[in-house]
Amino acid sequence: MSAIVDIIGREVLDSRGNPTVECDVLLESGVMGRAAVPSGASTGSREAIELRDGDKSRYLGKGVLKAVQNINVEIAETILGLDASEQAFLDHTLIELDGTHNKARLGANATLAVSMAVARAAAEEAGLPLYRYFGGSGGMQLPVPMMNIVNGGAHANNSLDIQEFMVMPVGAENFRDALRCGAEIFHELKKILAAQGMPTTVGDEGGFAPNFKSNHECLQIIMKAIEGAGYQAGEDVLLALDCAASEFYKDGKYHLSGEGLQLTSSEFSDYLGNLADQFPIVSIEDGMHESDWDGWADITQKLGKKIQLVGDDLFVTNTRILKEGIDKGIANSILIKINQIGTLTETFAAIEMAKRANYTAVISHRSGETEDSTIADIAVGTNAGQIKTGSLSRSDRIAKYNQLLRIEEDLGDVATYPGKSVFYNLKR
C-alpha cells in the first residue's frame, strides 16, 4: 500500500505572473509527487470553478490562499492514510468532499493539484514513468502537436479576432521531426514579420501577436513561412484555428471587429468554410459560441465531414455535456483541459467517451501555464493523438514538448507518430 502521509499545498506563480496552486504529496515510503495547475484566460461558463481569494490587497484579488488552505486542512484530513495507487477512489473522494457539481466549494484548482500530485507520487512509487502509469503498456503513440504560432483574441493585444493560428506537422515521421518542423516555421515566420516591420513580441502562449489587417492576411503569411522553411502546406503541414467564438459573440451575432463584420451563425459558418477552402485548415476549435447549439449544428452539418470541429468552451471536458453533444451530433472532437473538470479520473473519462463515439480528443494546456508537464504524459498514456501546448517559445510551453521528446526516446522503436491518420473520423 502506498499510503499518503503528508500533503502540502502552496501558492506559486503561473506564466502570467498570477497565483496558482501547487501541491506536494508524500508517501509512507518517502516518495513525493509534485504538481501545479494551470489557469485559462478565455474560459467556458460551465467550467469547474477556480477558487480565487478576491482580496484586492493581494495579487489584485487573484490569490489562491483559500484553495491552498482547503488542501492543507480539509483535503489533508480526508485523504491522509489513503492508498495513492487508488486514483479513481481518491478522486471520487475529493468530488464527494467538495459536494458541488462544479468544485465550487473546495476549488477545482485545489482538487486537481491534489489529484495530479497523487498520480505522480504513485507512479514514482511504482517505478514507472508517468505516461506508463497512466496508460500501461498500451501508451505508445506520440501526439501530433497543434503549434500556436500567431496569437490573437484574448491571448494578445492586437486586431485579430481569431484567438489562435496553429500549424500541425502531419508529414513528419516522428515527434522529434515534427517539433523541428514547427520550430523552423516559427523562426521563418519571425524573419518574415521582422522584414515587414512588424513586432516579433509574443503573446501568452508564445506565438507572435502582430497587427494583421485580417485573418486572411495572417493565414497568407503563415503559408509563406511554411514554404520558406522548406515544407509543403497541405502535405507536410496542415493549419488549425481556435476561434474562441464565445469571446466575440454579442446579441446573437459574431462580431469580427478587426474586419468590421457582424455575422449570423450561418454566415460565420460560411466564413470559416471559405477560409478552409482557401487554406489547408484541418481543425477549427470553438467555431461557435458555447451556447449557440443551433450554430454548432449548422457548422457540423456544413464542415463536419472534412474539418475537425473541436469543442472547448462547448464541452469543458465534462462527460455530461459531451454526451449531450454526441447524442445531438454536435462537433466531432473535444478539447481536454484538466482544470476544466478538476480531477484526472474525470479527465480520462471524457477522453474515453470521446473515443467510443468516434470523436477525436485533443489534450490541451491553458494560457496561464507552469513548468508542470503532466499533459504530455496524459497525451501519450491515453493515446489521444493530438496535443495543443503553445508555440515554440516560452519555457512553460517548451516544458511539454521536451517531455514528449523524452517519452519518445524512452519508448524507442515502439513509439509511433500518427501524422494525418490522427484525423480518423474525417473524409479528406
Swiss-Prot record:
Pfam families: Enolase_C, Enolase_N. It catalyses: (2R)-2-phosphoglycerate = phosphoenolpyruvate + H2O. Pathway: Carbohydrate degradation; glycolysis; pyruvate from D-glyceraldehyde 3-phosphate: step 4/5. Keywords: Cytoplasm, Glycolysis, Lyase, Magnesium, Metal-binding, Secreted. InterPro entries: Enolase (IPR000941), Enolase-like_C_sf (IPR036849), Enolase-like_N (IPR029017), Enolase_C (IPR020810), Enolase_CS (IPR020809), Enolase_N (IPR020811). One of its GO terms (molecular function) is magnesium ion binding. Binds a second Mg(2+) ion via substrate during catalysis. Mg(2+) binds at residues 242, 285, 312. It is found in: Cytoplasm; Secreted; Cell surface. Its EC number is 4.2.1.11. The active site is at residues 205, 337. It comes from the Bacteria. (2R)-2-phosphoglycerate binds at residues 163, 337, 366-367, 388. GO terms for cellular component: cell surface; extracellular region; phosphopyruvate hydratase complex. One of its GO terms (biological process) is glycolytic process. NCBIfam families: eno. Belongs to the enolase family. Catalyzes the reversible conversion of 2-phosphoglycerate (2-PG) into phosphoenolpyruvate (PEP). It is essential for the degradation of carbohydrates via glycolysis. This is Enolase. It comes from Polynucleobacter asymbioticus (strain DSM 18221 / CIP 109841 / QLW-P1DMWA-1) (Polynucleobacter necessarius subsp. asymbioticus). The gene is eno.
